[in-house]
From Swiss-Prot:
Recorded topology in the membrane: Multi-pass membrane protein
Pfam families: MatE (PF01554)
Residue ranges of the TM segments: 16-36, 51-71, 97-117, 129-149, 164-184, 194-214, 248-268, 285-305, 321-341, 355-375, 391-411, 423-443
Cellular compartments annotated: Cell inner membrane
Molecular function, one GO term: antiporter activity
Full protein name: Probable multidrug resistance protein NorM
CDD domains per the UniProt record, alphabetical: MATE_NorM_like (cd13131)
Keywords from the UniProt entry: Antiport, Cell inner membrane, Cell membrane, Ion transport, Membrane, Transmembrane, Transmembrane helix, Transport
Length: 464
């Protein structure tokens, strides 16, 4: 009789947490910048605060698309690192710079001409003017943000996640005084309001980019990589094709996920501000808690890729299931706390008792949502480690847009199945679609892991 070696899973779980914790803290620091921008701009006027929110609905989907293209690098680099082919890592990083050069211009143009979207949506003139100014300022930091991500992916790929954490916290520390100067007009500089947030963010992005590059150039653990010996090399279309085959599905999946929640808010807006507010409370809470499994998923990508590079398919499997076990244990805790303190959580955001009651109901659904969300993001992270990103895209598109959105809309806005449920209908759709996604991603992961090692590694060698 064959027994499971739980000690091996325990070892991999510890390594996962060591990689995931800095990723989590970096995410908290990054999200805190957005919170600081919202709070500080809100002290100027409600229009300035609204401009940050409206601008973010344009900025994040597009920038996350560019970010997603570069997420092909961590599994590629971790595989090379694990297989002892560190001399090939620099080439991948340099080709990542070409991905930035090819993507930055179209993304920048789309952001610059976002006024066309605002005209179509008939956004109020004053709000539109502030939002466009904010986005135009942010564009100057776009190349820096993507360059920083490129070199962060290098560090993540070799399982060095602490530098990004430290640099992001330094960026947060700089963001606050720069906001103070540019939003309110200090040190002889005019008051720019929300546009000042965009200026500050662009400067912070360049600051973090320079720090990240300086670290990579001087870190002892990267000297043998010789990334900067010839930082600019000709585009290698074979390498670029392989990276984009991995990164493009991730980019589209990220874009579609962000777009799903943005569209949900728009579809709820005719139902009144109270319903939109309750939805936003549940979404903000879920987004904050989502950072926990997301960090585990990113750590799983790195460690699965490294184990596969070492030729240890059994250890890659142990990493996948260790991440799932840890993630579900965390989900039990966070879901329980969400249920117990749902009213108190809602009271952090608003004082209106009707909104608190509606948000409390949505948070009950959100507690259930956390289990499916954990499984799908961790399984997706493991699949990225196996370089199987197209399956993630197909499953995401099917579950979110063929199942989740139609079901959510039907339950929320129509009487076809039952009286319209409002925001609850969309959240039920989220739970159902995420549960299906989690199931399909687990099936896909198990199918890949069931392959004979020779076939698995032959496929991975073609993708490196």
């Amino acid at each position: 009789m064959k027994f499971i070696d739980f000690s091996a899973y325990k070892v991999e779980a510890k390594k996962l947490l060591l990689i995931a914790l800095p990723i989590l803290l970096a995410q908290i620091a990054q999200n805190s910048m957005g919170l600081v921008d919202t709070i500080m701009s809100g002290r100027v006027s409600s229009a300035d605060m609204a401009a940050i929110s409206v601008g973010a609905s344009i900025w994040f989907p597009l920038v996350l698309f560019g970010h997603g293209l570069l997420l092909a690098l961590p599994p590629t680099i971790s595989y090379l690192n694990g297989s002892g082919k560190r001399d090939q890592i620099a080439h991948q990083v340099r080709q990542g710079i070409w991905i930035i050069l090819f993507s930055c211009l179209p993304l920048g143009i789309l952001i610059y001409y976002s006024n066309l979207v605002f005209d179509y949506m008939q956004v109020e003139d004053h709000l539109k003017e502030i939002t466009i100014g904010y986005l135009h300022a942010m564009i100057w930091g776009l190349p820096a943000y993507l360059l920083m991500i490129n070199f962060r992916c290098l560090n993540d790929g070799i399982a060095k996640t602490k530098p990004a954490m430290v640099i992001t916290f330094l960026g947060l520390g700089l963001n606050i005084p720069l906001n103070y100067i540019f939003i309110y007009g200090k040190l002889g500089i005019p008051a720019f309001g929300a546009v000042g947030c965009g200026i500050a963010t662009a400067i912070v992005n360049w600051f973090m980019c320079i720090l990240m590059i300086a670290y990579c150039k001087n870190a002892r653990n990267q000297r043998d990589l010789k990334v900067f010996a010839k930082i600019l090399e000709k585009p290698n279309f074979t390498t670029l094709k392989k990276l984009l085959n991995l990164g493009f599905p991730i980019a589209v999946a990220l874009f579609c996920e962000v777009a799903l929640f943005a569209l949900t808010a728009l579809l709820l807006s005719p139902l009144g501000t109270d319903i939109v507010a309750s939805h936003q409370i549940a979404l903000n809470t879920s987004s904050f808690l989502f950072m926990l499994p997301m960090s585990l998923g990113m750590a799983a990508t790195i460690l699965v890729g490294q184990r596969l590079g070492e030729g240890a398919a059994d250890k890659a499997k142990q990493v996948s299931y260790s991440a799932l076990i840890v993630g579900l244990l965390i989900a039990v805790i966070t879901a329980t706390l969400t249920v117990i303190f749902r009213v108190e959580i809602a009271e952090i955001f608003v004082k209106d008792r009707d909104v608190i009651a509606m948000a409390g109901t949505l948070l009950l659904i959100a507690a259930l949502y956390q289990f499916s969300d954990t499984v799908q993001v961790v399984a997706g992270g493991a699949l990225r480690g196996y370089k199987d990103t197209k399956a993630i895209l197909y499953i995401t598109l099917f579950c979110y847009w063929v199942v989740g959105m139609p079901m959510g809309y039907t339950l929320a806005r129509t009487d076809l199945l039952m009286p319209a449920l409002g925001a609850e209908g969309f959240w039920i759709g989220f739970v159902v679609s995420l549960t299906i996604a989690a199931t399909l991603l687990m099936i896909r992961m198990r199918k890949i892991q069931a392959q004979p090692d020779a076939i698995l590694f032959a496929k991975l060698e073609k993708l490196k």
